[in-house]
Regions:
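A short catalytic or substrate-binding loop motif that flags glycine-/basic-rich loops and adjacent residues
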Residues: 264, 313-318, 326-327, 341-342
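Active-site beta-strand termini and strand-to-loop segments that position acidic
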Residues: 322-328, 352
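C-terminal helical cap and adjacent loop that interface with cofactors, partners, or active-site loops
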Residues: 14-19, 33-59, 87-88, 319, ...
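ADP-ribose/adenylate-binding Rossmann-like module
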Residues: 168-180
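Aromatic/hydrophobic pocket-lining residues that form π-stacking "cages" and hydrophobic walls in ligand
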Residues: 160, 187, 213, 449-450
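Predominantly a Rossmann-like dinucleotide-binding segment in NAD(P)-dependent oxidoreductases
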Residues: 83-84, 193-199, 204-314, 334, ...
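N-terminal glycine-/serine-/threonine-rich beta1-alpha1-beta2 phosphate-ribose binding loop
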Residues: 2-5, 12-169, 185, 189-197
């Protein structure tokens, strides 16, 4: 067939439009009412349309971005939840300025194990609270506790943190600090009203590579920062079906939400690189999820626990990818996948006009290698081992250099020990912590924010400004020495 140029253009245009129409006809596009109204998930959970709204500060509340307390010679600690919390007990046992005065778990074997471990290291046995679901309330009522570590299943994080602060103690809460945006606001409001710290125990901010990249960013190696990538990619299929452990409760969230269920391990460090909450702020998020396949397939193939989970229906897509836009226009990609076979990765990437870093394995490219005395030919290649070693020697974080030897053998490559050392030392000296309740709320809010975006056809959803405007004047996180 002979088609003139003008006819060809019309033909291609018509074909393209027809293709678009066919594609759209096959898509599930949410209507306007669905996008703007409340969303009800299959389990009955309702996500309101105004979750991205910044709420006003109530009378009697004061900001806590620079909260300091009276210096103390010794910080008195209690730990609730002694599966994950055992690591915190052991970390505190290695700090001469910290004392674990009480431990708590519903399971007696875990309480005994934690008390034994501390007594063996320090020669003094902490009080034990165990056996019943609400025994922790007696612990937080004690008058001889400064800080309560909360390392329980997620549903207990917020009620325990609120009660802890109401009782005049600082709450150190495991990740994520909360699941819903409403609960994030409860943490913020209670911290401001009681003037007590509510810290998210994001240990990944204190890994060797994370501290290295933070120092590179603060020293200007990256130039002007513009993009970051992070994730929690971890094959947890066997863990999710393990009895007597986190599998007892963690799998439940795969039945309830379709979004990023565990954002903070990746997001916390890159938020600190970018100064989010301190000179920049989360603005909105767009999220997409793949189909749910992996967990169901694993369950059907393995029939864990003699097939007792056969009737369970999982809702969360295998891979969730969310993109966050900041107030300064920078972007962050956040991913979550715990149900497919893959090596572990948090991606941990940072990009700027002067350099790019990607982790797993650690790689760095710099725009002007000669500026740092490197052999590299330029930005089109990753630094070789010799150049990377040179950069680490120049820019290793002072906190890591100071504590590397003491942290060796600690949980998660030493980051658990440094996490406790840093924040308890800040309390001891009476200075502000590296992280505050606004970080805990913003990082944790991604769970419900991403779920609403997915449920409304990947529409943008605003992220609340939990600082209520303070981010505009707060200084970036400094380098801890």
């Amino acid at each position: 067939m002979n088609i003139s140029n003008s006819s060809r253009r019309e033909f291609l245009k018509a074909s393209a439009l027809a293709g678009v129409g066919a594609t759209l006809a096959g898509c599930s596009t949410p209507n306007e009412a669905h996008v703007k109204g409340a969303v009800t998930l299959p389990t009955g959970i309702v996500i309101q349309p105004d979750i991205g709204r910044t709420r006003p500060r109530h009378a009697g509340q004061k900001p806590v971005h620079d909260l300091t307390t009276t210096p103390q010679e010794k910080i008195r600690v209690a730990v609730i939840g002694l599966n994950r919390g055992l690591t915190h007990v052991e970390s505190c046992a290695g700090l001469d300025f910290a004392e674990v005065v009480a431990v708590c778990d519903i399971r007696e074997d875990r309480s005994k194990r934690a008390a034994d471990a501390y007594e063996k290291k320090r020669g003094k046995r902490p009080a034990i609270y165990q056996g019943t679901e609400h025994i922790w309330e007696q612990l937080v009522a004690r008058e001889d506790i400064d800080v309560v570590y909360i390392a329980t299943p997620w549903e207990w994080h917020v009620p325990m943190a609120l009660r802890t602060m109401e009782r005049g103690k600082h709450a150190f809460v495991e990740v994520s600090a909360a699941v819903t945006v409403d609960d994030c606001w409860k943490l913020v409001d209670t911290s401001e009203r009681t003037q007590k710290h509510c810290l998210i125990l994001e240990n990944c901010c204190y890994g060797e590579n994370e501290l290295f990249v933070l120092n590179l960013a603060r020293e200007g190696v990256f130039g002007e920062l513009n993009h970051a990538e992070c994730a929690y990619l971890h094959d947890l299929r066997d863990v999710l079906f393990s009895l007597g452990s986190e599998g007892d409760w963690r799998r439940e969230y795969h039945k309830q939400y379709d979004g990023n269920l565990y954002p903070t391990h990746g997001l916390g460090p890159v938020a600190q690189y970018l100064g989010l909450g301190r000179g920049d702020q989360f603005k909105y998020l767009v999220s997409v999820s793949s189909p749910e396949v992996g967990l169901t397939k694993y369950r059907n193939a393995k029939q864990p626990n003699k097939g007792k989970h056969a009737a369970e229906k999982y809702f969360c897509g295998d891979m969730n990818t969310s993109i966050v836009k900041s107030e300064l226009g920078r972007t962050i990609m956040i991913q979550h996948d715990v149900v497919n076979p893959r090596p572990y990765s948090r991606i941990n990437a940072l990009c700027g006009t002067g350099a790019t870093f990607f982790d797993y394995p650690a790689r760095l490219a710099v725009d002007e290698p000669k500026m740092f005395g490197l052999k590299s030919s330029g930005p089109h290649e990753w630094l070789d081992d010799a150049d990377m070693k040179m950069m680490r020697e120049k820019f290793s974080h002072p906190l890591w250099r100071k504590l590397e030897e003491k942290a060796a053998g600690g949980g998660h490559g030493g980051m658990d020990f440094i996490l406790s050392y840093r924040h308890l030392d800040c309390l001891r000296r009476g200075v502000s912590l590296d992280s505050n309740v606004y970080d805990a709320a913003a990082w944790s809010s991604i769970i419900e924010i991403s779920s609403r975006s997915v449920a409304t056809g990947s529409t943008p959803v605003n992220i609340p400004d939990f600082t209520r405007g303070l981010w505009k004047t707060m200084r970036p996180l400094g380098i801890a020495s």
